[in-house]
Amino acid sequence: MKVAVVGATGLVGTRMLEVLAERNFPVTELLPVASAKSVGRKITFQGKEWTVVSAEDAIAARPDLALFSAGGSTSAELAPKFAEVGTRVVDNSSHWRMDPTKKLVVPEINGDVIEKDDMIIANPNCSTIQMLLPLWPLHKAYTIKRIVVSTYQSVTGTGYKAMDQMTAERAGGKWGEYPAVYPHPIDQNILPHIDSFLETGYTKEEMKMVNETHKIFADDSIGVSPTTVRVPVQGGHSESINLEFEKDFTLEDVRRIMEETPGVTLQDDPANNVYPMPLYAWGKND
């Protein structure tokens, strides 16, 4: 399969390539796409060197699949151009997610909604996917009425420049003396917002979790109350979730469902200090 990765030299694009390799995805030809300053660079994938190409060259090559992680404006401009030449696009940006003509998909939840003619498929926000994958089997069993969620999101969610900011701060850099992507220092600090605030008082990140949950679960009646927080962790988002169900349940059954859910690893033995932590979840696919 001929695969293009748009944003291949970025933090998420690099991780995409790692996962493709880990899962032995059938890539016969790789088209790493990046901005003009990176064109011509060499990257290694599955033991071979590949040359970074322009989007125009990648489109001309008519790949079978294009994975996008280069920001919303890039997706808005380039995804239709890939689709026009017969390339199926999976977009990691927020641009297409709430477009009523596009499917917003978590394969384990609603992969069956994808049809042959769906050439641009939206990938949900990272915090939404992380929340909904374990909640889907619980929703099917008990019908979720309300979700109250707080997220503790790594600086990696902002990219390389955020990691550089935290590294500079940990090295003793003084505020204003190093490039910063956050409005305040992040080391030894937390930022009580991710993305900008809206008139409602929620942030854009929080509203993504609300709107995307409704679209993926195909149920606008579910109450979603999110608080998203940036924490000084380099790799691995965490979430605390409180659920209200329509139907009766037992904790034993909830644990059993979690244990049986593909993609979920249950760590729930607080008496022995066993619980999920980003340090140990980083780099894992569950």
Where in the sequence are the language-model features?
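Glycine-rich beta-alpha junction loops
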Residues: 36-38, 126-127, 151-158, 190-198, ...
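N-terminal Rossmann-like NAD(P) cofactor-binding subdomain of oxidoreductases
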Residues: 1-186, 221-223, 256, 268-284
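Generic solvent-exposed, charged/amphipathic alpha-helical segments
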Residues: 17, 210-214, 255, 259
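C-terminal active-site/capping subdomain that shapes the small-molecule cofactor and substrate pocket
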Residues: 224-286
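A broad structural signal for alpha-helix termini and local helix breaks/kinks
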Residues: 142, 217-218, 245, 262
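Oxyanion-binding "anion nests"
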Residues: 189-235, 240
